[in-house]
Amino acid sequence: MVHGLGEHSGRYERFARGMAPFGMATYALDLRGHGLSAGQRGHVDSWGQWVDDTAAFVAHVQGQASGEVVPLGHSFGGVVMLSAVRSGRLKGIRRFVLSSPALKLKAPVPAWKTSAARLMSRLAPRLALDNEVDASTVCRIPEVVSAYVSDPLVHRKISSRLYAEWRRAADDNLEHAAGIALRFLILAGTDDRLIDPAGSQELHARTLGMSELKMLDGRYHEPFNDLASDEVFAAIAKWLGK
């Protein structure tokens, strides 16, 4: 499990409990700059560092687990997962899962702001900006939202370098989606207010039959933490059983 921007692996305990009845164990990491891992909060020098982290983590899990390892990436972690798969470094992996991959933002970013971020990525790469995530949009369960807000390991930072690296990686993964040679499942909430589900639909359309897209009616950004999450866990288990 590779988490999204500003969060950490501990937020996936609900996911782990949901998949356990299907005989599946969950392993998760904190990307550098997140959770208990070292590094400036919300910063990465290059997208390749997160790809390195993911490849090393998958290899570690393969050394621990007795069965098939199926990587899953959520939101920003979904883009990292796509980059890692396309890099060819996830040896022995046959398929993977994406949850609300952050390919397109729901709120359009003005062109001037994107250009400014690219410039600042070169001039002041560690400049910390607010990631502008509205906690009320992560899911529809008040207790989960409250826990997200009060979680000391959740942060609201994104550096100018990370923003520029993410934008480049998201565009690159969409452009080269036809080259993905592994089967994968895409989960996207129809009412996601952070990430535009149109990005998932475009990815699916470009993958030449390698992906299965499941649009989750009424779900917000975090389907594993939202209402009726048991249905999502069952859908993943069903896909894995094919």
Regions found by a protein language model. Give the residues of each.
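The conserved beta1-alpha1 loop
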Residues: 2-4, 74, 188-189
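Catalytic nucleophile-loop/oxyanion-hole region of alpha/beta-hydrolase
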Residues: 6-9, 35-65
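Conserved hydrolase catalytic core segment
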Residues: 68-70, 75-96, 104
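Active-site nucleophile elbow and catalytic-triad environment of alpha/beta-hydrolase enzymes
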Residues: 158-176
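Short beta-strand/loop motif that positions the catalytic acidic residue
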Residues: 180, 186-188, 192
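Short alpha-helix in the alpha/beta-hydrolase fold that links the catalytic acid
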Residues: 182, 196-205
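Catalytic active-site module of serine/aspartate enzymes centered on a nucleophile-bearing elbow/loop
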Residues: 210-242
